[in-house]
Regions:
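Terminal disorder- and signal-encoded targeting elements
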Residues: 1, 345-350, 382, 434, ...
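Generic structural signal for beta-strand residues in well-ordered domains
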Residues: 172, 406-407, 445-446
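Extracytoplasmic/secreted cell-surface and envelope-processing proteins
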Residues: 138-140, 190, 423-425, 461-465
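Generic recognition of flexible, low-complexity loop/linker segments
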Residues: 177, 296, 400-401, 441-442
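Aromatic/acidic, Gly/Pro-rich catalytic loop(s) in extracytoplasmic/lumenal soluble domains
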Residues: 443-488
Length: 488
């Protein structure tokens, strides 16, 4: 009796044109929304607290700085917040949840329209991709990247159908491509090179026009942002650009954590699929992932970001590789294909869910075992901003105490970690927050006769010089505030 309803449900999903899209979209929305709800009332994402919230709340003040940093996405969020009178935090969170949902639709559409998969297998592909660490990590705080990647996937999907699509859809494709290059420099570069490569393969007039328009616009953007962009290549030749974080061991471990489990099936999917237009960005991002071999110990080419982007494209081929292996009975742990799909999918769902929803110190998150190596490139879980959520609560209490304490009067200088700058800008009242890459050196300069030092107890990093008198003014579970006075 139970087989009939199951069969009917399977038939509805297999034959329906709208329900599969709704299923995939709903799963993606639920996954990304849960991570926001679990963290409430605190935001998640390093750039959310240190970039998006401060910039949107003080947009005019920040505009001279961000105007040459590909500001399309943050400007869009600001416009939505102003036009609809919605609090910036809500706009930021809602936007990434929706973008994540549309990203899942892009993956499903690729499965249906390019890989010629049926609805059930396209659903498998979509779920497989959205639960990957690289995708979730990007949605954690790299919102511009996630937005631009989603548009890029749709653009490449439509371009692969040229010349079989209408002029209107070609115009839509051009628009999506333009917005993508406006949104993010790295993804814009990736899309531009992919478009050039696809134009050589297809040799279509309409595609050539689209490519020409996109390349011209992206070139103008690069020219307009020349000073900001030119800084990266200059770092390569500088002896001062050595960055211990970007050492080969760390980057190799990051690459393996992101991609090792995906590579075997990814190679199968790469060989078996005809997704030439998606193979181009995969290969480009692979090259970017290993720029550290030629230019070691420098962040100039952002190899960690390229590793994440490579993993996102690899997950598409890896998912298709698993489908191919299951359909060809190369993976046959069960006599039923559906069970084999579930056997593959469930571990990835577990790993992705643990990363999205578990506390920062949870034993469920196996990535914590590699924290020593990959910690500088991202969080152990998504339940984190620039500090952990419990530390966020404690920090707000400390800031409230500072704002209301008579000793830390208005005009006082508060020194602290650069990771706290967003919190301080948003919450600290009538006081100056001071931070630097090295606060110890800043104190040693003796520029400040009297100030306060706010330290995170779990990782105190500032050494107080001997020529400063220090007095503990405030202490909590996570933070200590010291009053410092220079001895003359």
């Amino acid at each position: 009796m139970n087989k009939v309803p199951k069969l009917q449900i399977a038939n509805v999903i297999t034959n329906s044109k709208k329900y599969p899209y709704l299923i995939v979209f709903s799963i993606a929305i639920f996954l990304r929304l849960v991570s926001e709800i679990l963290a409430f009332p605190y935001p998640i994402g390093y750039d959310v607290i240190n970039y998006y919230l401060p910039v949107i709340k003080n947009f005019e003040e920040y505009w001279p700085t961000i105007s040459n940093q590909f500001p399309f996405y943050v400007s869009l969020l600001y416009a939505i917040s102003e036009v609809f009178h919605v609090e910036p935090r809500s706009v930021i969170s809602a936007s990434i949840v929706l973008v994540f949902g549309f990203f899942s639709l892009a993956i499903f559409s690729i499965g249906r329209n390019l890989l010629r998969l049926d609805n059930l297998r396209s659903i498998f592909l979509s779920i497989f991709v959205i639960f990957q660490l690289a995708v979730l990590r990007t949605s954690w705080d790299l919102y511009k990247d996630m937005f631009a990647l989603t548009l890029t996937f749709f653009s490449l999907l439509f371009i692969s159908k040229i010349p079989k699509i209408s002029k209107k859809l070609i115009a839509v494709t051009a628009t999506l491509s333009i917005v993508s290059v406006l949104a993010d420099r790295m993804i814009g570069l990736l899309l531009s090179i992919s478009l050039i490569g696809s134009s050589f393969v297809k040799r279509d007039r309409d595609l050539a026009i689209v490519v020409g328009i996109v390349i011209v616009i992206f070139g103008l953007l690069l020219q307009a942002n020349h000073d900001n962009i030119g800084y990266n290549p200059k770092m390569v030749g500088s002896n001062n650009s050595i960055n211990e974080i970007y050492n080969p061991i760390n980057l190799i471990v990051l690459f393996l954590v992101m991609n090792a489990i995906l590579l075997p099936s990814g190679i199968v999917g790469f060989i078996r699929s005809k997704l030439i237009i998606f193979k181009i960005p995969l290969l480009i991002s692979a090259i970017g992932s290993f720029t550290w071999i030629i230019f070691p110990n420098t962040s100039a080419f952002l190899p960690d970001r390229w590793i994440v982007i490579f993993s996102i494209f690899l997950s598409l081929f890896s998912g298709y590789g698993f489908i191919t292996l299951i359909e060809n009975r190369r993976i046959a742990l069960s006599c039923r294909k559906l069970n084999n799909y579930l056997i593959i999918l469930i571990p990835f769902i577990f790993l992705g869910s643990a990363f999205a929803a578990s506390p920062n110190n949870s034993y469920l998150n196996i990535y914590g075992a590699f924290h020593q190596f990959i910690g500088p490139y991202g969080p152990l879980t998504m339940q984190y901003n620039s500090i952990s959520l419990p530390e966020s609560k404690s920090l707000l209490s400390a800031i409230d105490w500072i704002n209301n304490d008579t000793n830390t009067a208005e005009g006082s200088v508060i020194m602290g970690s650069k990771h706290l700058r967003g919190w301080m800008e948003l919450e600290l009242k009538e006081r100056t927050f001071l931070f630097a890459d090295n606060n110890t050196k800043l104190l040693a300069s003796n520029k400040y006769g009297e100030l306060y030092l706010l330290e995170l107890i779990s990782r105190q990093s500032t050494e107080i010089p001997e020529n400063y008198l220090q007095e503990l003014a405030y202490n909590s579970t996570d933070f200590s505030l010291y009053r410092l006075k220079l001895i003359k």
